[in-house]
Amino acid sequence: MFVSRLAASGLLLLALLALSLDGKPVHQSKPGRSPPISPLSAQQWMPEGRPPHPIPPLSVQQWSQGRPRSEVPPVVVQPHESPAGGTTAFREELSPGPEAASGPAAPHRLPKSKGASATSAASRPMRDLRTDGKQERQKWGRMVQPDHHAAPGGGGGGGGGARRMKGLAKKAMGKGCFGHKLDRIGSTSGLGC
């Protein structure tokens, strides 16, 4: 259907192109000779043969005098104590030191533990931006297949998986076909099965 509309509009354009403005068909000229075409007024130069505004020459950058200064601080190499406390190892940090953020008077503090608290605080902003986490995928899977546990097999009282129905999936089990969530933004079905 779309192709026929496209073809019809193309034929209409060809028919309109064949007609001139006063309704007469366009006379095709002889192939040997073409009529002279006058230049557009925008393409005409001044009588001197130069453009009306002077074009400045290109400026060449001199790199032989040294590299340009950049605002990016260099890589900071800081000593890092191991949790055992005996040896000191060097590590490279790509982030600027604490004096760059809060001034030279700020004391340097290393995290007391190298475990989850140091990494969780640093990765919290990225975790907050993540929309499709592991928990969301699990919830979505339970909403899509609420009768997943009905099949035989697996451990425990049900079958299939070892998880119990919780939250929205448990509420949706008794409703039948109405009110099931269709997607993650909260649209629910109002139609039957």
UniProtKB/Swiss-Prot annotation:
Role noted for this protein: Bradykinin-potentiating peptide both inhibits the activity of the angiotensin-converting enzyme (ACE) and enhances the action of bradykinin by inhibiting the peptidases that inactivate it. It acts as an indirect hypotensive agent. Neither synthetic Tf1, nor synthetic Tf2 show bradykinin-potentiating effects.
Any S-S bridges, and between which cysteines? C177-C193
Q: Where is the composition biased (Basic residues)?
A: 163-173
Q: Report which superkingdom the organism of origin falls in.
A: Eukaryota
CC per GO annotation: extracellular region
Low complexity bias locations: 95-123
**Compositional bias (Gly residues) at which positions?**
152-162
Q: What is this protein called?
A: Bradykinin-potentiating and C-type natriuretic peptides
Species the sequence originates in: Protobothrops flavoviridis (Habu)
Q: Which terms are listed as keywords in the entry? A: Cleavage on pair of basic residues, Disulfide bond, Hypotensive agent, Metalloenzyme inhibitor, Metalloprotease inhibitor, Protease inhibitor, Pyrrolidone carboxylic acid, Secreted, Signal, Toxin, Vasoactive, Vasodilator
One of its Pfam families is ANP
Tissue pattern of expression reads: Expressed by the venom gland.
Compartment(s): Secreted
| Basic and acidic residues: bias regions | 125-150
Report the record's Gene Ontology biological process terms. Answer: cGMP biosynthetic process; receptor guanylyl cyclase signaling pathway; regulation of blood pressure; vasodilation
Q: Which residues form the signal peptide?
A: 1-23
Give me the residues of the propeptide, which is removed upon maturation. 24-27, 40-43, 58-64, 75-169
Any idea which residues bear Pyrrolidone carboxylic acid here? Q28, Q65
Region of interest (Disordered), ranges: 25-173
Q: Which GO terms describe its molecular function?
A: hormone activity; peptidase inhibitor activity; toxin activity
Similarity-based family: In the N-terminal section; belongs to the bradykinin-potentiating peptide family.
